[in-house]
C-alpha cells in the first residue's frame, strides 16, 4: 500500500510540473485503473466544445515507472491535435520536451 501511495504522489507531482511548464488548453486528470498495459491517454470533447484529457495509470506501479508513464502519456496529449495516438515524429519531439523537464535536463 505504501508503494501505491508513493506512486500516486509522484504521478501528481509530475503532472503538476508538466501542466505548468508545457500547458495544454484544457484540464488533465489522472485516473487509476486495472489495465493490461501501463497507461493510456484520451483527449475528449463534449458537445459544447469543452475539452479535457485523462491519463489512466495501471494500479500497482512503482513511483519511477509512474513517472515514466505520465511523461509518455502527457506527450500523447501534447501531440494529440497533430497525429492522435501515434508514436510518430511529432510525439517524439513532445516526449523529448516532457522528459527534459521531468528529468531535470533543462
Where in this protein do the model-derived segments appear?
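Walker B catalytic acidic pair
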Residues: 73
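Active-site-proximal or metal-binding-adjacent scaffold patches in catalytic folds
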Residues: 1-68, 77-106
